[in-house]
């Protein structure tokens, strides 16, 4: 596509987007990727005034887009009064230096832009630590020769002197800070592991919402839990994990968690830093993969989510695909989607359409890992009374017969909970699992 200009309002950073395609057949994909980059730039508070898509067999080691294209890009940026040039790929430290010299303006890449958005969105201490760790790990190998704006990380100009001496100081301070932040995150991981262990002892199943950013996960979370978490038509609104209790129609309880949205080429440093959060997905009993049913790049987005799930060790978690925003589809588009993926759920979290059917599907999927048991309780025993109440929370009770101070309950119980159902009062004859 040709380079194009749009008008921008004042008092915002004016951005140029630059992409590269290695062949004519991939131009459409590269253009879609630039569209996504424009959304990221908007989320970061910039306004896009210039788009450039360069075609060449492979990236140039020095300037990524080639010397001639860098020269023409510099002229276009000057004409459009560009403040920041954003590349749709991760640039090497050498390419960043060359481009800043050639373009004479700030240059960042896709990774740095995503990190900036995460930094803006983080609200809790945990979220801020995770973003900071990712930013510092990204910055560390890019310090040599960067030469600008490092004083705010190194304690101010003059702490050690100019040039390489100051950069070495920055590097040492950053390594020290990385270690400190990592310790805080390790503490968070340990605390989360303890909380998961407690939940597992209660045997309340956990369902995690995962999906591409802006697929509607938080809107679905609000619909399922009757909460009012912030949901917006914007990227990466949810960074800090949310966990709420939900009661199924058969009276069983489950926990629903909302997680950070994924994106294609999610920076590895960010995935690593958010591992404490994403481990919640790896430990879930079921993952609901929320998909924007009307997204032009739907298949690519689905593949990106699956890659991140593999990276965080969640590839073995059962997944139910949930196509959201079906209110934006035509009847024919709905039918084609149902024919293509008959095992999936089709819903509209915004309107509430088919939410009840989704809840039934979740209950059914969770029931696959249950076993029918019959167990007798002594109603005079405090421990047994507590077990009865817990059984109603975690299992689907089929029958309840009471008499002579005893209660006999037949229920479909999660397999991992059965071993804990033998009561002290009735160690042998009290349970019949079949």
Identify the residue ranges that each predicted region occupies.
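Short, acidic/turn-prone active-site loops that include or flank metal/cofactor-
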Residues: 111-115, 235-236, 349-351
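Conserved C-terminal guanine-recognition region of P-loop GTPase G domains, centered on the G4
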Residues: 26, 33-43, 47, 70, ...
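N-terminal accessory targeting/assembly segments
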Residues: 1-115, 430-434
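Short alpha-helix plus adjacent loop in nuclease-associated cores
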Residues: 112-131
